[in-house]
Structure formats: C-alpha cells, structure tokens
Amino acid sequence: MNLTQEDEQRLALLRERAAAWDHKNALGEFESNAELDVYNEGIAYPPSIDEMEVGEGRPTLDKILESSIGSDSLPNLEDGPPDQEAAYHEGEMYSTMMTSYMDQDNENMDLSAGPTCSTPQPITGIHHKETINGRVTQMVYIGETSDMALINRLQDEFDVLYNTYPNRNKQGEIVHLIVMWSTPLKPSTRYSLSPAQPPGKKRKIVQHSSNPEPEIVFVPEPTSSEQSLPERQIKAYLQRGIELKGKSAEVPNFKITNETLGFSDANLKLLYPDTSLYPDNPVFILEDVFASTRQLNKIKVNYQLYDPVLPSI
C-alpha cells in the first residue's frame, strides 16, 4: 500500500506517541498493515489498552511492582503516602537557604558553606592591576595548582581574547588578562606568566609578593662561607624554596629539587630523577631545559628553567 506524504507524517507522529507509551507491539502491527486510525482531529493516536493484544511475556505494571517489592529504591508506602506538607516545607526551606546563599555579596561569601563536589573547582578573582611595557594588565587569580599545561591554556585564551575582543575596564582602558596562581607548597606566594613575548622569546614565570609589587627573583650566589659548608647544610639551604629565574649561572653544590621549583608531587612526571649526588634523596631535573656539566659540585642552571612549557617524558 502506497502512503501519501500526509499519511507518512501521521505515521511518524504515531511512532513518536507509540514510543512515548512504549506500545511497541501495537506499532509493529500498524506498520505491517499500513493502517492508520485517524480520529476527527486528524491525528493518529495509539489504541487504548483494551484494544491492544499484549503478549504473555510482555512486562506489565503489576509484574514490575511485584519484582520491586522490598527494593530500597522505592518508597515504603505501607504506612500511607508521604507527608506532602512536610515535603513542601522542606523544599521551601532548602530553596530559601540556597537563595540566601546565592544573594550574598561575593566578597563576604563563605565558599566553604556552599555545595561541594569531589573535584576541587578553582576560585577565580581579580588580584590586582599593573602596567607592563605600557600595557594595562589585570591579574586573574585561579587558586592553588601545579598544572602548568592548564595555566598555559588559560593564558593562551586570554591572549587570543586580548587580540580579538579586548576587555575594557571602567576607565575605558584595554586590559590584558594575566593568569595568576599559587602552588600547594607555597600557597602564600603568587606567580604569573609574563605577557606574550616577541617571536623567538619564551614566557617567564614572575613571582609576586603580597604587596603585590613584583619581587625580583634571581639565582642566589652562595657566599664563601656557604660554599664551605658541609654538603648536607648546603642542601638544606637550597631546599628553603629558592626560586630560579634570570640569566644562567653556575652555582657550586647546586641541585634543583622539587621544593626549589615550588611544584607539588603531581608534576614529578614532567621531571626525571637524578641520584648522582644524593643516592638516598633523588632530585628531579627538567629534561631538555636543564643543562648539566655532570661534574660533582657544579651544575649549570639555564634561565629557560622557568619556561612554563615543561617537557613530558
């Protein structure tokens, strides 16, 4: 039997309605006979339950309920239906609580009082504004993280935004957003990436003090007394959290540790261990960025050590 376009549309509507009521047997019968039960409204409806021939093996509502008796997923209705009034007041109380929570001022909001989830969410906020090389920059603090790949992706997006649809502050100045973060080992210290450099030059990590004026960070040159200290004391001196930045330098008895980099153990996959100097306490070297003379008491630290794009091994 050839169906007209109108009949095909009605059949499609019938399929949707039949699927909604889960009348698969009825739908199969309609398609095989190519018959449409069209009412006065011109819409095809599935037949009533009395008109349908349901197979013996087809699950019915009674069978479903019988198999679910005692299930923890169903409410216990032996003592009567749930108290609708109590449920209403409980929902109203929750709604009021959430509305009150969301209406709080952002600065006074207690983030620990809100809903929680298993995956920590970074709390972003404007840290401070400064002018770098004539460009107004706005630091956006994203909280504690050791994921340099995430930081680079965010900064790349901010750079694209600045070059395509730049933001303007209340004074009408074009603002370049800069990612700012802290590390789990140094939660009170703020870091940011230097703005996009000309071709051939790489970004550096900038450390900020709480002022938050930028702080000069450099590789310290040990004094003569420090150079003569026993190896263990020199090692402790280096593990206080010295940040490495600036031009390359040769420092006696110097080894780069995870603490001096300010990263957590989550970033060890980006480094490889070296036990040549301290077999019982391996240090981690940046591959392809760290240049070593492989001499016992002299390690050459390349300024590219602070390039945020760390190699993956």
UniProtKB/Swiss-Prot annotation:
GO CC annotations, alphabetized: host cell cytoplasm; virion component
Domain of life: Viruses
Region annotation (Disordered) ranges: 189-208
Principal localisation: virion
Post-translational changes noted in the entry: Phosphorylated by host kinases. Phosphorylation play an important role in facilitating trimerization and possibly P-L complex formation.
Keyword Endoplasmic reticulum: no
GO biological process: viral transcription
Keywords from the named record: Chaperone, Host cytoplasm, Phosphoprotein, Viral RNA replication, Viral transcription, Virion
Subcellular location: Virion; Host cytoplasm
Subunit structure: Homotrimer. This trimer is stabilized by binding to the L protein. Binds N(0), and N in ribonucleocapsid.
Function text: Essential component of the RNA polymerase transcription and replication complex. Binds the viral ribonucleocapsid and positions the L polymerase on the template. May act as a chaperone for newly synthesized free N protein, so-called N(0). Plays a role in virion assembly.
Protein name: Phosphoprotein
Gene name tied to this protein: P
